[in-house]
A protein has these predicted regions:
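Conserved N-terminal phosphate-binding loop of PLP-dependent enzymes in the Aspartate aminotransferase
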Residues: 1-430
């Protein structure tokens, strides 16, 4: 069967034929390729087409797909049993690795998804402070829990529905919205609601409305404001964690939050996430505190094995982040060179191995700037990139993920694809 036929069948069985909306390729007007396997820097569809992968399962595959050490660890763990619903030494070992890499994680809990990690962190912050209000930023995405589906990014932004039906107004009445990279908007909220705000949650690098870096002083400003008002500062590092640096964005920018959520890389590609932070806050979590959180599959031994293998690889290979920076800078240069060569009205944003191209003539520093990008031009760029053998996110509002498995030949092919895509997207859509 080919992707079109599988997709038709999938649409009879699953909403939109997919298990996560952006995978349906609606934003680019195409049928999604159905994937058969992946290895290293490549992903293969059911027709046998090989693509250079810049999605990387939406971030986890920082070292490439099916890394031998990770596969070996998963296999060994699965042979012993796929789930116990009981504590294991593997959980302790992984927690120690996380704490070594990210010292602010004094205590932590393992869960199954980024959504669950964020949902739990917010509940704990509310329990710790005795307050109800949460501050989030427009365009930032923190999973699909009800209270955070307000002016959200990622798939909601892709589908042009930043709020979700099915969420009672009462669930979002305690969610306050600030503007990313705008400290004044944050200060105004705290001046009005400061004694009611339990936590402020932020993607330290916004990566779910495309990649938008924090401006100088923004993250430190958030740290100062939350400290002044006694609110918990939560960094959502589901994407940035272990990607920008071994210690995540908090290490990269030198700003320490009270709590952090991790996902994607921390599970080595398996369903795994972690939340945690200061000991006095995490002491509120059951069974030693009054905030309840539980999960049958939390700390799943197979996922724990994958995450442990992944973090060990990142810790042992001290040059991996230098290589990622070199490869990412080279791809960024290819984008910027083609933009200049073909006089394309576009902006390229990059932080480490995360980047985005926006088809707009204004610098992209905020959600409002993001919304000026021409989506038809992005769709044309996407179609040419796919035809050139590049597997990239089918949405303007998702990141371009660089991985360490990319070879010199892959980079050269990518440079040629970018040149072709920006040439054609400019000529046909400008």
């Amino acid at each position: 069967m080919n992707s079109q036929k599988i997709f038709e069948k999938a649409c009879e069985l699953m909403p939109g034929g997919v298990n996560s909306p952006v995978r349906a390729y609606r934003a680019v007007g195409m049928t999604p390729p159905f994937i058969f396997r992946a290895k290293g820097a490549y992903i293969y569809d059911v027709e046998g087409h090989q693509y250079v992968d810049y999605v990387g399962s939406w971030g986890p595959m920082i070292l490439g797909h099916a890394k031998d050490e990770v596969v070996k660890a998963v296999t060994a763990a699965a042979i012993k049993g796929t789930s116990f619903g009981a504590p294991t030494n593997g959980e302790v070992e992984l927690a120690e690795l996380i704490q070594t890499a990210v010292p602010s994680m004094e205590m932590m809990r393992m869960v199954n998804s980024g959504t669950e990690a964020v949902m739990s962190a917010i509940r704990v912050a509310r329990g710790y402070t005795g307050r109800d209000y949460i501050v989030k930023f427009e365009g930032c995405y923190h999973g699909h829990s009800d209270g955070l589906l307000v002016k959200a990014g990622s798939g909601l932004l892709t589908e042009n529905v930043p709020d979700s039906a099915g969420v009672p107004k009462a669930f979002t009445d305690t969610t306050l919205i600030a503007r990313y990279n705008d400290l004044d908007s944050v200060r105004k909220l705290f001046e009005q609601y400061g004694d009611k705000i339990a936590a402020l949650i932020v993607e330290p690098v916004a990566a779910n409305m495309g990649v938008v870096p924090p401006e100088d002083g923004f993250l430190q400003g958030l740290r100062d404001i939350t400290k002044q008002y006694g609110a918990v500062l939560i960094f959502d590092e589901v994407i940035t964690g272990f990607r920008l640096a071994l210690g995540g964005a908090q290490s990269y920018y030198g700003v320490t939050p009270d709590m952090t959520t991790f996902g994607k890389i921390v599970g080595g590609g398996m369903p795994m996430a972690v939340y945690g932070g200061r000991r006095e806050i995490m002491d509120c979590v059951s069974p030693i505190g009054p905030v309840y959180q539980a999960g049958t599959l939390s700390g799943n031994p197979v996922a724990v094995a994958a995450g442990t293998a992944m973090l060990k690889l990142l810790m042992e290979d001290t040059a991996v982040y230098e290589r990622l920076e070199e490869k990412s800078a080279r791809i960024e240069h290819a984008f910027k060179s083609a933009v200049e060569k073909y006089h394309v009205k576009a902006q390229v944003n990059r932080v480490g191995s995360l980047m985005s191209i926006f088809f707009t003539d204004r610098p992209v520093k905020s959600f409002d700037d993001v919304r000026t990008s021409k989506l038809a031009q992005f769709a044309q760029y996407f179609r040419v990139m796919k035809a050139q053998g590049m597997y990239i996110a089918p949405s303007q509002y998702e990141a371009f993920f660089v991985n360490d498995a990319l070879s010199e030949a892959d980079l050269q092919k990518t440079e040629k694809a970018i040149d072709a895509a920006l040439s054609q997207s400019f000529n046909e859509c400008s």
